[in-house]
Design a protein with these regions (language model features):
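Alpha-helix-loop-beta-strand connector modules within alpha/beta enzyme cores
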Residues: 345-366, 383, 391-406, 438-466, ...
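Catalytic cores of alpha/beta
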Residues: 362-377, 406-418, 449-454, 458-459, ...
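Conserved phosphate/ATP/ADP-binding segment of small-molecule kinases
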Residues: 121-200, 350-420
Length: 506
């Protein structure tokens, strides 16, 4: 069944913001949007001419109709015109969270001022928001002006952004996304911030030069809501929302005499529309004065790989390395997780020797020091290793670097390093590693491949067996990595033949 997302917000007669923008954005991400209208605005591209709040009785009737038949996975809230509306919505949300079998995620975009500068509330609602609504909100998505209105913190630099986010959290909000469209720092760039589960995420991209920005805030929060309803983690929803808005700004047009609306396109398919993940040591990180940890060693642009990796066997012993190479598996990875194994260095050296003997590509998982020492073809690292591995040493040694990614945020983070290949997973649940909350599935893989395939060889990994391998290969991914499909097969040799046939490897 299609995911249902509600928008509790105002109507924009000009069609650029409010529930009109919400529904377009939700549709672009394949979810069904429902609405409860809080206000009817008379507006066009030049501004808001009047604001007409809907009575609480009519709002409640809309909510009761929806909840009786079409409960939401996520509820996005936009313009609330007065204190009575805030109190009513808070009462309903409290009941949903207490009684629904699957309590909804609440995304709140605190719309107070239109792009044109016109006020969008009948009265000062800040105190009522802090008292009644914010303690129920899972994700709040204010812009610069709305952040300052709610917190009293003026966003004059990164530390002020962090301070404002913590102030919002103190009101009971669970996670914060602060939109940087009005914060021109560094000049010519749009910097956005997210705080979620004790971690911060910064995104940046060059500002899109267009005056047609009406509805960007509504649309971004609606994309985040749609993605959350489909199981994306917030950091990925944040990324996709930004990419969608960037694409929409590039395609935006004028329909009247004033500011045009952001365009609504589709799932963002061009890497040029995606923001950069800002990290310590990067140019934007330096501009924002991010502290660089002592152990952090940034490097980018690793040795390339010719062609695709094909069937990729990930195994934990030298014997399995030899069996795979003997049976014409051209890419293998030695994954020994026991760093205290007394034969660790011996096994790594032998695996590299076998790779040279059979003409195969042998990647060493994690143990980059020994991989350098013994001249491995390459190293495979996880995201957590990027903070501690000596990436310059790996690059200077000429080793190829493969990186694991689990979703779109990690994909873009890995892209900063320009590795030799990118692995995306886990595609399916797997018993070889705890991937709770990180199962990607075929739908996400189908989006990942066209984004990255022109940049790097791509690898799909996680829970892939013979029965699943052909549908994984059909996404266009360049390599299919397997573990148990070979090591637990009755005949590993025949399993290799069958797998290569299934993925179309000659």
């Amino acid at each position: 069944m299609s995911k249902v997302v509600w928008s509790i917000a105002g109507s924009d007669s000009g069609g650029g913001a409010g529930v009109q923008a919400d529904l377009k954005a939700m549709h672009s991400f394949g979810v069904h949007g429902c609405t409860a209208i809080t206000a009817l605005t008379a507006q066009n591209s030049l501004g808001v001419e009047s604001l007409n709040a809907v009575s609480t009785e009519v709002i409640e009737a809309q909510l009761l109709a929806l909840e009786s038949d079409m409960p939401a996975a996520v509820i996005k809230i936009g313009m609330l015109a007065n204190v009575q509306q805030i109190q009513l919505i808070a009462e309903h949300l409290t009941r949903y969270k207490a009684r629904w079998e699957m309590p909804p995620v609440i995304v709140y975009d605190p719309v107070a001022i239109a792009t044109s500068g016109d006020a969008l509330t009948e009265e000062d609602t800040v105190d009522a928001l802090k008292t009644h609504l914010l303690p129920l909100v899972d994700v709040i998505t204010p812009n610069t002006h709305e952040t300052q209105l709610l917190t009293g913190v003026y966003l004059i630099g990164p530390d002020a952004v962090r301070e404002a986010a913590q102030k919002l959290l103190s009101f009971g909000v669970k996670s914060v996304v602060i939109k940087g469209g009005h914060w021109d720092y560094p000049k010519g760039y749009c910097i956005d911030y997210c705080w979620h589960q004790e971690a911060e995420y910064w995104l940046g991209n060059e500002s899109v030069n267009t005056p047609h920005t009406h509805g960007t805030g509504c649309s971004l929060s609606s994309v985040i809501a749609a993605c959350l309803s489909k199981g994306y983690p917030l950091k990925d929803a944040f990324i996709l929302g930004k990419a969608y808005i960037n694409a929409g700004l590039k395609a935006a047009k004028r329909y009247g005499e004033g500011i045009g609306p952001v365009a609504h396109t589709h799932f963002p398919e061009s890497i040029a529309d995606y923001p950069q993940v800002i990290e310590p040591g990067s140019w934007l990180g330096d501009e924002l004065e991010f502290l660089v940890p002592d152990e952090y060693n940034y490097a980018a642009g690793f040795a390339p790989i010719e062609g695709e990796l094909g069937l990729y066997a990930v195994v934990d012993t030298v014997d399995w390395i030899e069996l795979c190479l003997k049976n014409d598996v051209k890419t293998v990875q030695l994954r020994i997780k026991d760093a205290d194994s007394p034969t660790l260095e011996q096994d790594i050296a032998k695996a590299i020797e076998l790779g040279n003997k059979y003409g195969g590509r042998v990647f060493i998982n994690d143990h980059w020091q020994l991989a350098i020492k013994h001249g491995a073809y390459g190293v495979h690292l996880g995201q957590e290793d990027l903070n501690v591995a000596d990436l310059n040493a790996i690059k200077q040694a000429g080793l190829r670097l493969g990186l694991s990614t689990h979703g779109f945020y990690e994909m873009l983070r890995a892209h900063n390093y320009r590795p030799s290949y990118l692995a995306f997973g886990a595609i399916y649940p797997t018993t070889t590693k705890d991937m709770t909350g990180q199962i990607q599935g075929l739908e996400k893989l189908r989006h990942f491949v066209p984004l990255m395939h022109a940049e790097y060889p791509t690898v799909a990994i996680g829970g892939i067996d013979l029965a699943r391998s052909s549908e994984v290969a059909a996404t266009g991914v360049g390599s299919v990595a397997v573990v148990r499909a070979i090591t637990e097969a009755q005949s590993p040799e025949q399993a290799i033949i069958n797998l290569k046939q299934a993925i179309g490897e000659q």
